[in-house]
């Protein structure tokens, strides 16, 4: 504070120097900053600092302030009667003893509830690893919390692992159940309690505003104010502000649900891992050295522990050098340990091979959005010193000796047919998005000239989904896809590194006056090798003369300082220590994402009888897939461009088509047909011919044959009878013919020889006998027709109606998802109870065993090992598909990088092996063997006013319960599974495929690379690697190899099972299952609780009559009936159809004492005769239904026809009349023949 201002709250003003007295001038009043104003300003600054401090991720402890010294004041004059000095009271500015903060109310509440219900989990050393919770008769703890529960009764419990989440549980001892927590499924967005204070629930996430909590808190409960467990903590992720928690909660059904953040870290206290360096162990997170202090020893430490599980922890600790003194932090990451290099590019700017600073090592194109990940020999995002600088890059210059140079990122370009879009970069890696082309070129401008490197690789437009678009649309729909993560911090795996081998540098040797000198650069160690009579070698740091050598070509000089890693490239000589290797993280991992894809124009649909026509318009190639929903799916797939029309047949079982990225559409044929089933014979024949052409032709043909056969047989019988009766009289001259024979055979007793003569004789002499003769055949026909009419009900076969037994409550439900089945439970003494069962979903879940996973492989080509003046032997390889070969006489005398003194004895060891691709964790396929399947159904059951939804295994044994109701379902009437014995799962799609067994893979086919998991060490591969002899012009490792079988299978996998499965099954994974398969029927036994029944107190209709006003079959509730009734009183009555022919829409109606009610029903029958009951009183409805006008609908039929209702009464009448007449004629002829035989037999 400025001293010129007077502070009344502080010490007094400074004493003024003595001056002569003068009259005081009257000065203008100036603003006088008072002490109160100063305090207000200080208070404002304190509040602002407090608010900013609370907004940080974690609260920092307040800085310890020094106690202010008391200000000196002027001594006061002593008084005469001075009191003895008393103890001075503590002022505001005097230091006080720090007090332990008192827990808040929420924290005290949580501590009180946790006292006897939360238990500590400790390891063998007694350290707390996490916690377990006693809840609802179980002890629950996270699976990642290792150790033993610190409680005598719980220490020896056997835990069971959860099948879904990272949890395990054990049964709580009986004596402890009364002290267990209860849990709640209600999660309003309020504050909750836990051990460290308040937890906020908002937006579906639990967060800690204060940021407290960390390792060791896993397993702690989050409680509400009543003491019930809302969630169990698994871990957390730091956010600004606060901490986001990973928790396990419960839904309404009691099922556990895990909510986690993408950067969540498990909060179990990890066991410290130990690493090794020079036979000395140390904690991996606290290494004895770091890279900034001792680079050589640090690289040795990392190479020694390269396969340690805590290698990443050690690498992170080696990059940080903790010191007591606070220094300015410099950006340091793993690529600080590396250096750029010169790689052999096969096509440079001059179209010739050259050593390029931007050689392309590898290109990944696994992303679905067309983004490429490229590895080059330069390092992007670092300056010359190796410090992270996003706008710079460093590369190895082409001078002698090569030196690291620096450039701008803007000078680095990637081309295909046109320049690519640069998205992100880190170290050796860059991700770009390129236009189509047949090659990829990297370019770097160095001192005004362009350095380029080109490799052949076809780059095209990539698409995801069912439409081949070239550019992603602005609007469309979102579907899952694979993209490269553009943040630099995440890892996609490891890239192998090693220290560079010995490279001869000519500039380090100097020849002067017939003498040879070694001239190291400042600060470097140089190793020389000379062959001047004897072999000489050594390491020097200053200019040194080589005795006995006269020419510079007799020596080579090698830099001995290797404090940087380089990529394990086949273009570089391997280091002397051929086994020491390191590894660094590959940035930009492949991850699951959501991509925007176009939506094709909806097709024009035109329906016809049992057929459909689609008019399709596609601006780009669009996939159309179809299948039938019956037993024979007949799947089709076609890529369509332009405007086309496709026609498809539709069955009653259903038809499904999927156009582009639109959702699948299912349609069902209606039994619409021309003609009239209740009209004249030609209309009836026309109608049934369109519905059932084969059966109609068969029946008509059979009837025609029967009529012809009946007529022929009748004529033959009559002729035979007449001849047998007349033959004896014709052989006897002047024999008298009996009157009855004359009458029946139309025979003239005297001289009549013709039928006309006989009838004329009867007409002239006896007209009565003439009419009797004509009436006898007609009477026989009428009699036979009446007999057939009486026997007709016994000749027809009708299916029995489905009806619920009042005591067993057993029904058989068609396994048709989302199709309701209704029954009426009639129990003596109780009112009828409506029972409705709807199959919501039926799952066919097979038991599976994963044989292996396969993906694209990555061929590792280590730097070659060159042995001058000798040979080497191939080591025993433990890698997958390891191939090694030694080539002798490969490099000439003192050639290039080899620099060998021999001419033909030089050897090169080339080896290769295969490992899983870095993106295999995201992009891989599973080979799964399928075994016996179980069936599980989700049923919605409504009885009375109660509705329950249960999941039950359809095996006829396992019961399911919902409150007081018990249900047993199954077994399914048809054994069915859409899965073969072997299936492949890839990106959520399932394919029936006969894959090779584990260990029997073939090159270029599915299964050429096999592993039990993406992180397993049991990798098997067969990729047909053949090493070739290197050429003498440069160091390299040539080879040939079969293409990836995984990529070949992806391009030729065909349609997934979800597009080809019969019965409309929808195939899903996790777990593998087939949903909504409409196959077979489902026997169900329901035990309805007694409380659902009510004593008879409903109205009792005494008169019930059913009249069908209109009926259209094969439509959704296309029939209307009217029930006319008389009842003893008004009330609510249950109505039900007791036949599967018709289904009523309403389960109950309100009745008056007298009146009528209208109900709607659905039927598939032409002639629907069904029984309807109202409050126990039954009546029969007769409906003659007309065919529908629409041909297709979007839902399946609600009823099933039987034989008797499938044929109209009019058709039966015509059939009966026709067949009855023929049968009567044949019967009369047979009777006549029998009488004639009997008559003639008596006269023989």
Swiss-Prot record:
Q: Which terms are listed as keywords in the entry?
A: Capsid protein, Disulfide bond, Fusion of virus membrane with host endosomal membrane, Fusion of virus membrane with host membrane, Glycoprotein, Host cell membrane, Host cytoplasm, Host endoplasmic reticulum, Host Golgi apparatus, Host membrane, Host nucleus, Host-virus interaction, Hydrolase, Ion channel, Ion transport, Lipoprotein, Membrane, Palmitate, Protease, RNA-binding, Serine protease, T=4 icosahedral capsid protein, Transmembrane, Transmembrane helix, Transport, Viral attachment to host cell, Viral attachment to host entry receptor, Viral ion channel, Viral penetration into host cytoplasm, Virion, Virus entry into host cell
Instruction: List the residue ranges of the region (Interaction with spike glycoprotein E2).
Output: 160-165, 252-256
Q: Where is this region: Interaction with the capsid protein?
A: 720-724
Biased composition annotated in UniProt, kind: Basic residues: 57-81, 99-109
pH dependence, record text: Optimum pH is 7.0.
Annotated domain remarks: Structural polyprotein: As soon as the capsid protein has been autocleaved, an internal uncleaved signal peptide directs the remaining polyprotein to the endoplasmic reticulum.
Q: What's this protein's name?
A: Structural polyprotein
